[in-house]
Amino acid sequence: MEHTYQYAWIIPFLPLPIPMLLGVGLLLFPTATKNLRRMWSFTSVLLLSIVMTFSVNLSIHQINSSSIYQYVWSWTINNDFSLEFGYLIDPLTSIMSILITTVGIMVLIYSDNYMSHDQGYLRFFAYMSFFNASMLGLVTSSNLIQIYIFWELVGMCSYLLIGFWFTRPIAANACQKAFVTNRVGDFGLLLGILGLYWITGSFEFRDLFEIFNNLIYNYNNGTNFLFVSLCALFLFVGAVAKSAQFPLHVWLPDAMEGPTPISALIHAATMVAAGIFLVARLFPLFIVIPYIMNLISLIGIITILLGATLALAQKDIKKSLAYSTMSQLGYTMLALGMGSYRAALFHLITHAYSKALLFLGSGSIIHSMEAIVGYSPDKSQNMVLMGGLTKHVPITKNTFLLGTLSLCGIPPLACFWSKDEILNDSWLYSPIFAIIACLTAGLTAFYMFRIYLLTFEGYFNVHCKNYSGKKSSLFYSISLWGKEGQKTIKKKIRLLTLLTTNNNENEKASFFSKKVYRLDSNVRKMTRPFITINQFDNKNTFLYPQESDNTMLFPLFALALFTLFVGAIGIPFNQERMDFDILSKWLNPATNLLHKNLNNYGDWYEFVINAIFSVSISYFGIFLASLLYNPVYSSLQNLDLINSVAKKVPKRIFWDKIINKVYNWSYNRGYIDAFYETSLTKGIRGLAELTHFFDGRVIDGITNGVGVTSFFVGESIKYVGGGRISSYLFLYLSSVSILLLISYFFLNQ
């Protein structure tokens, strides 16, 4: 066993040769490297699979032995200061390593087909491998210095992948927005690390926790409690930015401009999980400061509600899932703030697999839609243009439904077990927080089934002729989350003004993207099913989406299995001779470090009573979403009698106002982006303009004024002189005499 832990250092370094070799190969042998691109992708998957096997082996040893291993190499700079580098293998490390490698492998396999048409195929795999290596280095770090180094590398990789299509201005802007927002958190993290070192004199976690706890409990040592709390707050700010928690969450929806596979990896196992990992790693430090714990739980509950409300009106399928990630990680942050360490990690695990499944499923949908509507994200990711995909992409539909039900908290899927545990703990912590968390669970079920119904149920809206973004029907305006038109729209209006009827069958509709994307020779030839409809003299050919290839479907199957069964590791009850709670055994060393004897077990009766309430709320959200978005109710838009009766009801006006307010709040992202734009962006630009004015008119004015004054004085004196030295000498002596007399006069007074 000891021999196994000695080689744990290979975990972060094994995927590292891929980006290095790809960089050298593309620089020196570009043609040969590109011709062997499938070999590079296979090698990436192979190396990450070896790391996964090693991580699973370490986890099995930890479950059986309940031990923590740390290896450190000391680098002495002088007698007073030395840097120590090493790796730490504990339950948190093993959990995160398995999470990163399993999700990473699925994303790499999926990306082989998804990115096959892209010119940056090899660059994408280089970034992805470096991303995985950086995240593995982060979770195996044994001190704060290593944490910060890999923290920055994880951020750098995420910026590169968010702006992967950097020629698109919107992607470049999203990359810059993520960078600037995370700079705030990273600066806070750096200040916190420096402050802790100034207080404790150590970067190592175990030494740091022991010294910090002694300083907190011994008030006579002169340590300023406010300064200690401020350092902990700075550390938490870093986690807030990385995990897209309020108020530094604004970068997350814009990060969807990157390729869909990287969205899955960022939201499941790397970027946003890094912030949760940091709080979990420093949990022994935070838990001794009640004010910080209360702040963590407060930020968590605000993020839970905010993320859920912002997801209600999104039409972009990826942005809807992004806000879902923000809300679900809020549950994890709430659990950490309440002190529920086990529940937080449990929900991090279950959410990661469910969200990876949903993002890869959305990528499969987008991939199939691109052949119909073009490569513009405004079209291929727009749920308004989808609908009726059940019969066209049945496998994607079933796996997406599984992930949706899991995120809604429906038993026996993964997220049910973890979310239910957090909800139960919240009732003991704060009834107000518990009420908000439970209501948000219903909102989660509502917006997740909204995504599912708009995408898969009904009819394929691209070819729908009797479709308009604004209808007089209450049901239809709700289902699209659009504002109701003031006038009744005629049925002959098509989906969008871009969808026009073309009698010339050789002329493509203007809706399709006019921009030509050049595909390389490795693009697989794909045929799309189509239906030809002859109506009198018009002949219309309709294309429909097609199911993705097996290399994209295999990760969906694998993640669906994880979504089904991963919740079994944390079933929170222990009955006669039956111990299902593998997670508690796994976390024993960590809970012992916290000096807590947590009892996570309950009986079946208590568990069922608590679960019935949370599941009922989720089913109510699903029912409400089905009521508003089900195609059966949407078809009622054609019944003018119902619409006329509904308009006469007085409550209809009040109901429409509520809908519009919720829509405006959600569609405008809670006006938070606008507030930042007004207060920060425009404020900084105004300050820059003021500084430019002061520098140009005042500073430069003084400098130039001295020069101009000297010039004119010199010119004036030039005409006074007559060219005789005796005159100059007389003038000089006279001036000196006058100055001496003036000085003498003032001194005597």
Swiss-Prot record:
Gene3D superfamilies: 1.20.5.2700
Keyword NAD: yes
Molecular function as annotated in GO: NADH dehydrogenase (ubiquinone) activity; quinone binding
Cellular-component GO terms for this entry: chloroplast thylakoid membrane
Membrane association type: Multi-pass membrane protein
Major localization listed first in the record, in broad terms: plastid
Residues annotated as transmembrane: 9-29, 40-60, 89-109, 125-145, 147-167, 185-205, 221-241, 260-280, 285-305, 329-349, 356-376, 398-418, 427-447, 553-573, 607-627, 727-747
Catalytically driven reaction(s): a plastoquinone + NADH + (n+1) H(+)(in) = a plastoquinol + NAD(+) + n H(+)(out); a plastoquinone + NADPH + (n+1) H(+)(in) = a plastoquinol + NADP(+) + n H(+)(out)
Its biological purpose: NDH shuttles electrons from NAD(P)H:plastoquinone, via FMN and iron-sulfur (Fe-S) centers, to quinones in the photosynthetic chain and possibly in a chloroplast respiratory chain. The immediate electron acceptor for the enzyme in this species is believed to be plastoquinone. Couples the redox reaction to proton translocation, and thus conserves the redox energy in a proton gradient.
Oligomer status and interactors: NDH is composed of at least 16 different subunits, 5 of which are encoded in the nucleus.
Family: Belongs to the complex I subunit 5 family.
Name by which UniProt lists this protein: NAD(P)H-quinone oxidoreductase subunit 5, chloroplastic
Organism field: Vitis vinifera (Grape)
Lineage: Eukaryota, Viridiplantae, Streptophyta, Embryophyta, Tracheophyta
Gene name linked to the record: ndhF
